[in-house]
Amino acid sequence: MSKPYFIPPIDEEPRMPGSEAELDPPPQWEPRYKGSERLKDKVAIVTGGDSGIGRAVAALFAREGADIAIVYLGGEEDADAAETKAFVENEGRKAITIAGDLGDVDFAKSVVAQTIDAFGKLDVLVSVAGEQHPDTDLGDITPEQLLRTFQSNIHSMFYLTQAALPHLKEGAAIINTTSITAYAGEKELLDYSSTKGAIVAFTRSLSAQLAPKKIRVNGVAPGPIWTPLNPFGGSTPEKLATFGADTPMGRPGQPNEVAPSYLFLACGDSSYMSGQVLHPNGGMIVNG
């Protein structure tokens, strides 16, 4: 390969994240309360902003006064991205959609360049996009799948953050998405869980590096959340049948129950927090 970037064959794995419009019941992603301008006139990049948690974050940030660059894979997800963009604009804010694969370093650079061209600045970087492929046996994880999962979940985070840093100033916030699997493990998601552990370490280490610049870096570790990721190939049918039932609350979470964690970490309410991870996971205790 001329560069460390792997494009999987079309028929190798289900395409992710899939269309949110096809989910039954539909996820709850719209903000549940009025905004209070906690992100007034800020500019945010939100990856995975077409659907799921990313869509809920983009919608809530817009309600709180931010303009949004919605980054997503493209293709089947175009309609979802357009709906997210329309919501942002209906909130009186500006939005652009940028489609492509963040595992490609050149695309990651392009995302930041397009955001700066459109809005002139960048205040908040939110990385949500990722993928997972269930395997019950370690031996079933191919080298291609391993590379692809790390490329989508953690390499992309390095690339996008590297591109964004020259534009982030004092008071900026970086928010990374890890997972409960980084703390509790998941026997059918060995490669995915490994990337999420790497994200925790990346978040803590980058926080230490950027603290002198007064740029905060935190993370969110969701539990089972009802998004397209699991129904569109990210979970086995057996797991999907009882998705979220093993949490103390006995149900999966909704995207708009997770988005406020990102808002808290993006705004001044969390001005004395960096290197931390919030755990919207239905009451599971992970001591992380």
Task: Set out the residue ranges of the language-model regions.
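Conserved mid-core segment of classical short-chain dehydrogenase/reductases
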Residues: 3, 7-8, 34, 104, ...
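Short C-terminal tail/terminal secondary-structure segment
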Residues: 23, 30-31, 135, 184, ...
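Canonical Rossmann dinucleotide-binding motif of NAD(H)/NADP(H)-dependent dehydrogenases/reductases
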Residues: 37-70
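Catalytic Tyr-X3-Lys loop
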Residues: 123, 139-158, 175, 199, ...
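Active-site helix of classical SDR
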Residues: 161, 195, 203
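Alpha-helical segment proximal to the catalytic Tyr-Lys
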Residues: 166-167, 208-212, 271
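Residue(s) in the substrate-gating loop at a strand-loop-helix junction
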Residues: 179
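A glycine/serine/threonine-rich, flexible loop-to-helix segment
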Residues: 188, 212, 224-247, 287-288
